[in-house]
Amino acid sequence: MDLLPKSSKEFAAPEYWEQFFRRRGERAFEWYGGYLELCGLLHKYIKPRDKVFVVGCGNSELSEQLYDAGCQNLTNIDVSEVVIRQMNERNSNRRPNMTFQVMDATQTTFDDSCFQAVLDKGTLDAIMTDTDKGTLETADKLMSEIGRVLTCGGRFLCVSLAQAHVLEKLVRHFSQGGWMVRVHQVMQGSTSETGSQFPMPVFVFVMTKVRQISGFPTVLEMMPDEEGGKPVRWGSPEEFMEAVKERQRYALIRNRLNQNQSSQEVSLDLCDGDSRKSRYTFYIVDSPAVRLSHSNHFAIFIIPHGRETEWLFGSEQGRKQLAGSVGFNRLIIVALHRDQQYTDMKAIQSELSAKVLELAPPGLPDNQQIPFLSAGEDIGSRTIQHRGKSEFSGEYVVEDVRGDGNSSYRRLIFLSNQNVVQSEARLLPISTHIGQKKRKDKKKQQKPVKDLEQPTITRIDKSYLCCEHHKAMISGLALLPNPGLLPECQASVLVIGLGGGSLSLFIHDYFPGSRVEVVEIDPSVLDVASNWFNFCQDERMKVHLADGLVHINSLADNGEACYDVIMFDVDSKDPSVGMSCPPPAFVEKMFLQNVHNILNANGVFILNLVCRDTDLRLKVLNVLHEVFPLIYAQKIDEEVNEILFCRPNSERKFSSLELKESAKNLEKKLRKPGVQWDSTYSLAEMLKSVQIV
């Protein structure tokens, strides 16, 4: 039997409700929940002595249960004569102080300020089926009538699904009238006779009528889920309504995840109740291929502090791999946020236990213990060393984190894209001990002083290149003539884009004959590299604070510069383009021609290309080919990055085998006794799949 409206128009029609109640007969239809779900809130705001006006009562048992609980001065109205007759017959003897009247809620016959409380459960929703002018006028009449009959200090309790247009009308009307507005979320949904649930949560809005005071801010509050929690106050109706919509979105996610496995990763943020800043990010990953047993339905994985940018945790593909490897049907991967304090794993588990159960998969056995997993024995470490703001990239942080194997790293992260590490360096901590020298002159000998330990000095491991594309760019130097002699040759290198300086420093330190010039547009980046990444300039290392486009065009116009190597490692600030490295202007033909003009005839132009748009990538390659006749490409494993090695002539073509052999010879020269080398870095390996394009 279909008891729910077939369309929103039926939802508001009196004829529908007449038919509806005839079909229901004596049984109560508890629209949006019954007394058990609502009683806690109702008795919080409605006192036994209050005179209560119930709008659109229907044949709900709510008024009867309120009466039996002590709130006996109840006046109920409804537009349906059928339901009012039924309710009067049912209650006239048992509940003599409660009245039921046929009346239109938009034009009642009650005196002004005669009620201390007004209760509406779904009537406003039923009226506001759309945003037509007539509908909005009817809603305004209803709310104005409620305001008229309610005494100052009285409360209007509105139980609603808070659809967007209803929410807008309700909040705007009462906040603009100077009323205090508070909202509670009651439940996930109301269970129907078939066992299905509403996909949207139910809210109780509590509007308190107060005397308007000029200049007094409107009070807009959302109550937390847990008992005893402090209300969250919002500064504007827009913020308040967005908070309600966030609850609705979360409820829809819960509903979907509780009933089905998700074929796609679902992510959401949990915010701190006081600061409203993100405290946790959840990534919910289902692995349908996992064979279910009693104990592998559900688990939580905590990413150690500071490691959320690693591929395994920071990419969807990596998280999918992680979920498959741990062997649970559903895995919630939890990222911790900077600027939030976490005590230990036990405290995190206690904080999240209730929330993660809301996102449990279907079929989770009752009382099953949910395991909390991690990549280490503790929650990791993150120390913010410096904060700043760049004119070009916005706010940024420099932070030290402990990675896998207790290695420590320093990272530059722009907060506009927190999942991407702009620069990273491996740290080498050292300490210096200052002891007292022994004196032969006993008369002058002072009392012994304990050895003093200076504060730990942080040193950068300049052999470490964190980015795989940086390693590939260095490997591309094997394309130069006589790579075995290259480290000592006076090669001239132009690098566009500084970052933390690791790429430029590597060239400077491992190619002692080189002369490196770096062009960086952002002074803040140079400051960070110099102050926090041990970058320094000397006679072989010079930084130009300039726009790379302008600088290269100027060099080409002057016709004096000639470089053996030109490297582009510069990102785009325009997210609307399907290419994040480099900016489109850097691959225009006229500009590339200037790059060609300042490149040695036997030199190499190395471009870090990050392009997700296949058509745009093809276009870039076509333009490059118009300027550079020979181009090698090396894809970076598990990344979008592609390194292009562009030669100004095609007289000498290397096979993949020849290039790898050339890279091996170059690496032999770079691995000098007494010079630190990253054992994980193989130049030849970085060119394993290079090909001419």
Swiss-Prot record:
Transferase among keywords: yes
Catalytic activity: L-lysyl-[protein] + S-adenosyl-L-methionine = N(6)-methyl-L-lysyl-[protein] + S-adenosyl-L-homocysteine + H(+); N(6)-methyl-L-lysyl-[protein] + S-adenosyl-L-methionine = N(6),N(6)-dimethyl-L-lysyl-[protein] + S-adenosyl-L-homocysteine + H(+); N-terminal glycyl-L-lysyl-L-glutamyl-[protein] + 3 S-adenosyl-L-methionine = N-terminal N,N,N-trimethyl-glycyl-L-lysyl-L-glutamyl-[protein] + 3 S-adenosyl-L-homocysteine + 3 H(+)
Keywords linked to the UniProt accession: Methyltransferase, Multifunctional enzyme, Transferase
InterPro entries: Lys/N-term_MeTrsfase_sf, Methyltranfer_dom, SAM-dependent_MTases_sf
Gene Ontology annotations of biological process type: methylation
EC number: 2.1.1.-
GO molecular function: protein-lysine N-methyltransferase activity
Class of the enzyme per the UniProt entry, highest EC level: transferase
A Pfam family matched in the record: Spermine_synth
Similarity-based family: Belongs to the methyltransferase superfamily.
Function: Dual methyltransferase that catalyzes methylation of elongation factor 1-alpha (eef1a1 and eef1a2) at two different positions, and is therefore involved in the regulation of mRNA translation. Via its C-terminus, methylates the N-terminus of eef1a1 and eef1a2. Via its N-terminus dimethylates lysine residues of eef1a1 and eef1a2.
Protein name as it appears in the record: eEF1A lysine and N-terminal methyltransferase
Species, as recorded: Xenopus laevis (African clawed frog)
Biological classification of the source: Eukaryota, Metazoa, Chordata, Craniata, Vertebrata
Gene: mettl13
